[in-house]
UniProtKB/Swiss-Prot annotation:
ATP binds at residues 15, 175-176. Substrate binds at residues 56, 143, 155. Its EC number is 2.7.2.11. Residues 281-358 form the PUA domain. It catalyses: L-glutamate + ATP = L-glutamyl 5-phosphate + ADP. Signal peptide: none annotated. The lineage of its organism: Bacteria, Pseudomonadati, Pseudomonadota, Alphaproteobacteria, Hyphomicrobiales. Pathway: Amino-acid biosynthesis; L-proline biosynthesis; L-glutamate 5-semialdehyde from L-glutamate: step 1/2. This is Glutamate 5-kinase.
Amino acid sequence: MTRPHLKKFRRIVVKVGSSLLIDSAAGKVRGEWLSALAADIAGLHGDGCDVLVVSSGAVALGRSKLKLPRGPLKLEESQAAAAVGQIALARIWSKVLADHGIGAGQILVTWQDTEERRRYLNARSTIAKLLEWRAVPVINENDTVATNEIRYGDNDRLAARVATMASADLLILLSDIDGLYDAPPHLNPDAKLITVVKRVTADIEAMAGSAASELSRGGMRTKIEAAKIATTAGTHMLIASGTIEHPLRAIMDGGPCTWFLTPANPVTARKRWIAGSLEPRGTLAIDAGAVAALRAGKSLLPAGVTRIDGHFARGDAVIVRGPNGHEIGRGLVAYDAADADRIKGRSSSDAAQLLGVRGRVEMIHRDDLVVGGPLGDSA
């Protein structure tokens, strides 16, 4: 199967591991390498691609700055090292991207931020706004309060969750290895690189090794887990070596890597999840004008909503019904039941004033809406 080209993707998440970012022997950031990576990111950004960075390294950078001895750290030591490292890490990314005229915005997340719906929606909205402003979100694990990320190396899976949250169509995991091999390459000189994986099977999972460096605890196994998360959500993923300068350019030039492909795309995968995997918590009744708007691919605005039923929180799944009670579709509602009831039937400007917010108010954004319920047409 032919491997895709990076320039076909419009939203890319690049994950950078600690062992790439930090020169452990010298105890400092690999400045020239990071500048080269920033140049690669700037090239994609200049072509109109949205780029997000998920950067490990807070703990590693903190322990370097604090001159902590080699070897395992206790949990509280790792968290304290992260507190020092996060400040330095944000400053470094801001500088290398500013050298190319690109703004950066730091977002600190934990695994729980991608799982708990309200926090998920807040983080997703922040990412969307930064991308709208053409800034590069630099997303770091909040190691000062997280525990599993530090102990178990969940950063690859966190990157996959971020890619899902951002509706990215590609996740790139830069590593200290070219990709997935059919045997451990450091033990078997005849090991072959798997260039394309169309589906993560038990055989593929069995190929994943568990070795990891001192600074980066995520081995190949967590990368395979990340691939399962990403491809299920409609995001392609690739693993490539980041040890060389200009690693993204090397991928574009046909350098070695492993692609994990998916037949879906983020929007269709997300809508399939909304339609079939979530238990609805309430119902929104809408008028005929809103039905026509939804069928034309528009978002659901408060003005078209006539009744609110149920007790739901922001981000919960709800059923949308037309004037005759038939199901029009399902979606993730942007407001809890109380606020939704306050703004139903109102213009967007009136709704914004009632809620004390600025900008356009949407009851359900079109990306969070699946039109065409199991009960058929309704208006």
